Amino acid sequence: SAASDVYKRQVYPVITGSGGLTLAKHLEVPFTQEVVAVSTALQDYAPQCDVAIELGGEDAKIIYFTNGIDQRMNGICAGGTGSFIDQMATLLQTDAMGLNEYAKNYKSIYPIAARCGVFAKTDIQPLINEGATKEDLSASIFQAVVNQTISGLACGKPIRGNVAFLGGPLHFLSELRQAFIRTLSLGPDEIIAPDHSHLFAAVGSAMNYSEDVCVPVEDIIARLKAVSYTHLRAHET
């Protein structure tokens, strides 16, 4: 059967991303640092890239490529990330894509704190009570993410030249991407927005595969079944 053929197919597995190192150890497969994976993919797709901005569900990072690699990443707080956007969308009784649609027709931007969901809620609730439109609030939420990323991660280091936008939020939310472009005053030739930007770390990790580790898919599935979530968490702490 087709399933049997897939299970027996030989693959070169590689893991990257948050929490990936622990899983890679238990599965006995190679691990690639996310910054290495992203750098590899960008060198292949857009070697002219000077800076990459990547937003994930709970992390945000800026990677500078000029004069060596310099990665800036947020700490334990998920402010200004995908989960923050989801929290704010719930306040407006919509989802992330709903925010994106609203933001397309904004007229005003309000100051909102993005360093923490709690602070942001205290900024947004009075605006809702005062009758601010969902269009303006949505655009303001995206602008808050931009401000948090630039001020919290760049810390004064200029973001200039050719800039790549990576990760799920920047891939699916066109208005969030536009808020960055607008704030950074980027020209059309300076914008790097790959078609599969939300999968860039995975693409880059695959490009860093090891020829020494080749196993059938069914072996990986068996190893996954043998690893418990509780066991993984115990090894991360």
Regions found by a protein language model. Give the residues of each.
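Glycine-rich phosphate-binding/hydrolytic loop that grips phosphoryl groups
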Residues: 85-86, 193-228
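Adenine-nucleotide phosphate-binding core of ATP-dependent small-molecule kinases
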Residues: 120-151
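Glycine-rich phosphate-binding loops at beta-strand->alpha-helix junctions
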Residues: 18-19, 155-183, 194-198
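Phosphate/pyrophosphate-binding loops at sites that engage ATP/ADP/AMP, CoA/4′-phosphopantetheine
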Residues: 4, 8-11, 149-161
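Short, small-residue-biased leader/transition segments that mark boundaries at the very start
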Residues: 1-7, 234-237
